[in-house]
Amino acid sequence: MATSPPGVLASVAVCEESPGSSWKAGAFERAYVAFDPSLLALNEALCAELLTASHVIGVPPVGTLDEDVAADVVTAPSRARGGAGDGGGSGGRGGPRNPPPDPCGEGLLDTGPFSAAAIDTFALDRPCLVCRTIELYKQTYRLSPQWVADYAFLCAKCLGAPHCAASIFVAAFEFVYVMDRHFLRTKKATLVGSFARFALTINDIHRHFFLHCCFRTDGGVPGRHAQKQPKPSPSPGAAKVQYSNYSFLAQSATRALIGTLASGGEEGAGSAAGSGTQPSLTTALMNWKDCARLLDCTEGRRGGGDSCCTRAAARNGEFETVAGDREPEESPDTWAYADLVLLLLAGTPAVWESGPQLRAAAEARRATVRQSWEAHRGARTRDVAPRFAQFTEPDAQPDLDLGPLMATVLKHGRGRGRTGGECLLCNLLLVRAYWLALRRLRASVVRYSENNTSLFDCIVPVVDQLEADPETQPGDGGRFVSLLRAAGPEAIFKHMFCDPMCAITEMEVDPWVLFGHPPATHPDELLLHKAKLACGNEFEGRVCIALRALIYTFKTYQVFVPKPTALATFVREAGALLRRHSISLLSLEHTLCTYV
């Protein structure tokens, strides 16, 4: 028991009549299918708990700032209050969205302390609390083969899913579901309530299942173990050291971006990377190419050959062909993830067009978070993780205006060029019908005009055509078109033609893994599929980690713009890496300086 992480021991020793009783009757009777939208309906209280856990927690500012200090320090987050559709401030294509609020203004919350606590999760030498929780269950209860099969299914789906807010939320929900499925009835142990008490956080889920991928077995280069003559490692464990260097880069970038929630205003977006970030991050960013080179599937291939991305693109084409021949009848549960995306992103910089549905979703989220925060107040007071103790104070509360930023990949609230750090369209890739629809939408935009009409100018007419012809839409009650309208043409343009993060995410998403497994209606085949995943223990990504190193460097430079010489060097090196992987994008300079 001495190895249990702070706060988790209590969370696995509660009785079934308390938090675990929020599961609906029969919730664990069905066969487990990872990333099944219908699972979200089995525990509304857990959904509310995770939605609350996705928010930054604010506390009243300590004292009143002196005038001299207030002139230099801004404790309020940079995200403009009031939602994405307000249209206030200088929301031009290249400028800040709104001026930062007065840190001493009445009613504002100080998000600095929570940002500092959240940053600590992404320290390279901090243990993974998801791994520690699993180890604690293993020591206390033992892990059955059935649990291993279900957990392996969840891990495989996370490797094939887009890195986005919806995926992180679903992974958090289903991790709790898998643990409670196997230990609630027999051991009276539940993880429901652990996020409310900060025993686990949404950042722990992000780090374990997506950022570091603690279960990944390919060392960051897909197919490495399948090579007939793998390159000899210079020393035992060299592959893990190389992967850890990438993890340091990614986690350092994430820490810096979280820090913008407390660093004050928009000045970080215009400051040089050398002055606006920690020296360790600056060094890591400058050395991103060396980090990527060791994890690049194209490194050392003088004769060319297929890259991870060309193989992924070919497999995507195969899936589209097969899926187009026999598209299944979508069940109403399919669109639960579309509604989840709307709930998570309404009123954030990911959505720039306002409307009744968006305002209703944002208000529903705020009401749910308020209620859940109050419902767990007593549990937080009795048992909270020590580093989050100050957030049990009566005046501490979620920052509802910022929204669920902790569930997003980049965890900052910046907006520029009518785009935000979280891409709405990347979230839609989690739905089979939308994965197909987005591919068809891009093809329609490209071939819309035979003349030299710009790609950007083709987007709105194509969306108009899609809206006018229900036969070409997914049978989702108009959700897809509504979400495209909410994102706006700039976000669509950025996703399809400009942003390396979006382009690489489309390569990472594996439709065969997400949608090509046996359904729950074929229990024997499904059980065999999960058993193969568990016994094979081959959890490989779809693209090499070199591209992820590029993503985190690029996204950090969008917020902390480097000096011109460093920027030019990065653009040249990043462009070369993308070309080696057959990824064609519009000007990286344009994307760096115009969007975020």
UniProtKB/Swiss-Prot annotation:
Location of region: Zinc finger 2: 423-502
Pfam families: Herpes_env (PF01673)
Region (Zinc finger 3), start-end ranges: 308-581
GO cellular component entries: host cell cytoplasm; host cell nucleus; viral envelope
Keyword Metal-binding assigned: yes
Comp. bias regions, Gly residues: 82-95
A molecular function (GO) term: zinc ion binding
InterPro entries associated with the record: Herpes_env
PROSITE patterns: HERPESVIRUS_UL32
Region (Zinc finger 1) location: 128-214
Assigned keywords, A-Z: Host cytoplasm, Host nucleus, Metal-binding, Zinc, Zinc-finger
Major subcellular location class: host cell
Binding-site residues for Zn(2+) 2, renumbered to this chain: C423, C426, H495, C502
Residues at which Zn(2+) 3 binds: C308, C309, C544, H581
Binding site for Zn(2+) 1: C128, C131, H208, C214
Region (Disordered): 76-106
Subcellular location: Host cytoplasm; Host nucleus
Entry similarity comment: Belongs to the herpesviridae UL32 protein family.
Record function comment: Plays a role in efficient localization of neo-synthesized capsids to nuclear replication compartments, thereby controlling cleavage and packaging of virus genomic DNA.
Protein name (database record): Packaging protein UL32
Record organism: Human herpesvirus 1 (strain 17)
Lineage, highest ranks first: Viruses, Duplodnaviria, Heunggongvirae, Peploviricota, Herviviricetes
